[in-house]
């Protein structure tokens, strides 16, 4: 047993113990992080009604764009960080993490500026109707100021987990989310601020989470940072982007699909008994429900990522196989539990996000049951897609991400909407989910056969 293995439990500790220690805090952190927008939408829905829900749905692509870039930087940097540690390249690990911090701040400032300069054209592009635009402008115009801090919260969190401090990363997000949960009702109802109150509550909470995460920099256990590490190294940016490309494509593709969905719901909803605003509002509510599922599965993946990256880098291939086997079993169990809840209580879940008329609830239940129908296999698709960048195969992961969102879901949505109107949109999701599952599982089985089942000595 070499010195590195003695120092790093990722190479020697039981896989089940490691996954439990790493994944549970990551799941909690992700679910809590998802609550930033969900709590806003719940309180806005209760205070303003379903038009408020529609407004946050229209503004949500801004959040998913930030998540796409933040996760690309964070997951890409964390993957490279663990691969470097597995190869005993501590200096490179430091430089990658330092570059990631500078990149997150820079990207956050750029996105904030673009949103503030082009707010209304962006919201119109995202599918806003005349009734929704005013609410959405109020919300997004304020939350734009929190974007740099949100980027840090999203992107630096995986690096803290990569250092083995999953609990700290979880607590940093929980602090912000709990603060948001307290400030939301205080600002919306107590100070009678409405949607602007929810927006300011989100910004303040994001600032606090970012500060807590940045305070961890001098506490890293696996490396000791130097001031010179915190600069933009374009060679490191390239590596970070390549390993984080799958996460970026997954999120940005979801953003494109969401924008297309909003516009299709606006167009074909207007031709139905529901009108445009109800389908857009319901689409936002159901997507927020689905975000909880995504948060759980991505948390599992993020918990496994350091284990996979370190052991693949150290050529301990048997541990890679063992980790993936356990990860997929846990994913299927959790996905099935959530699927049962989603399908059994769609009305109650819709009602959590505010009141509406009979047509609103009718469309909400139909849409939720169909959209979430294949939740029990969606988890496996996500885990398989994000496995490949964790072991350095970024291109394959990127291709699989693109396949689900851009090559399957988007064409199916357009085809069914033009053929069957808003009813066609309801069934586009489950059809695409099943096709994507078959593709991803086939590729995964083929690729896993190429990874040795025995370890190699790392010289």
Model-assigned labels for residue ranges:
Residues 16-35, 39, 62-69, 145, ...:
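Residue-level signal for short hydrophobic patches within transmembrane helices
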Residues 50-61, 136, 140, 199, ...:
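Small-residue hotspots at the loop-to-helix junctions and early N-terminal turns
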Residues 1-23, 81-148, 190-245, 308-373, ...:
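Short alpha-helical transmembrane segments in multi-pass integral membrane proteins
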Residues 74, 143-161, 169-177, 198-213, ...:
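Short runs within selected transmembrane alpha-helices of multi-pass transporters and secretion channels
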Residues 21-40, 142, 176, 205-209, ...:
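Transmembrane helical elements of multi-pass membrane transporters/channels
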Residues 65, 180-184, 210-214, 292, ...:
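Hydrophobic transmembrane alpha-helices of multi-pass small-molecule transporters
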Residues 35-53, 123-130, 186-193, 255-285, ...:
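Helix-terminus/linker motif at the lipid-water interface of multi-pass membrane proteins
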Residues 53-113, 150-169, 282-340, 344-346, ...:
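Small-residue-rich hydrophobic transmembrane alpha-helices
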């Amino acid at each position: 047993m070499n010195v590195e293995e003695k120092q790093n439990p990722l190479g020697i500790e039981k896989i089940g113990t490691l996954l439990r220690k790493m994944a549970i805090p990551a799941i909690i952190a992700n679910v809590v992080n998802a609550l930033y927008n969900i709590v806003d939408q719940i309180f806005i829905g209760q205070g303003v009604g379903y038009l408020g829900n529609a407004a946050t749905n229209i503004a949500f692509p801004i959040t998913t764009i930030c998540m796409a870039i933040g996760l690309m930087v964070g997951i890409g940097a964390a993957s490279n960080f663990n691969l470097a540690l597995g190869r005993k390249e501590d200096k490179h690990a430091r430089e990658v993490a330092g570059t990631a911090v500078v990149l997150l701040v820079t990207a956050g400032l750029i996105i904030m500026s673009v949103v503030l300069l082009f707010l209304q054209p962006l919201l119109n592009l995202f599918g806003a109707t005349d009734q929704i635009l005013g609410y959405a402008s109020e919300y997004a115009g304020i939350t734009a100021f929190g974007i740099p801090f949100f980027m840090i919260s999203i992107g630096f969190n995986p690096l803290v987990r990569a250092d083995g401090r999953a609990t700290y990363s979880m607590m940093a997000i929980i602090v912000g989310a709990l603060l948001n949960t307290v400030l939301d009702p205080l600002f919306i109802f107590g100070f009678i601020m409405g949607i602007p109150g929810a927006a300011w509550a989100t910004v303040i909470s994001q600032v606090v989470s970012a500060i807590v995460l940045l305070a961890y920099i001098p506490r890293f256990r696996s490396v000791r940072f130097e001031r010179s590490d915190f600069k933009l190294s374009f060679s490191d940016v390239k590596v970070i982007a390549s390993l984080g490309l799958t996460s970026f494509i997954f999120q940005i593709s979801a953003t494109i699909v969401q924008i297309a969905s909003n516009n299709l719901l606006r167009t074909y909803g207007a031709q139905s008994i529901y009108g445009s605003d109800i389908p857009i509002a319901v689409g936002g509510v159901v997507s927020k429900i689905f975000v909880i599922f995504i948060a759980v599965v991505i948390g599992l993946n993020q918990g496994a990522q350091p284990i996979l990256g370190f052991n693949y880098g150290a050529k301990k291939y048997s541990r890679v196989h063992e980790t993936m086997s356990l990860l997929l079993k846990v994913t299927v169990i959790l996905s099935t539990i959530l699927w049962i809840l989603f399908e059994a209580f769609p009305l109650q879940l819709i009602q959590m996000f505010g009141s509406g008329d009979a047509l609103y609830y009718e469309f909400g239940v139909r849409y939720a049951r169909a959209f979430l129908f294949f939740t029990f296999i969606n988890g496996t698709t996500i885990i398989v897609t994000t496995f490949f960048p964790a072991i350095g195969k970024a291109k394959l992961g990127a291709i699989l991400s693109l396949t689900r969102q851009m090559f399957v879901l988007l064409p199916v949505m357009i085809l069914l909407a033009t053929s069957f109107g808003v009813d066609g949109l309801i069934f586009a999701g489950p059809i695409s989910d099943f096709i994507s599952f078959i593709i991803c599982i086939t590729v995964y089985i083929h690729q896993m056969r190429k990874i040795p089942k025995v370890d190699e000595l790392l010289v």
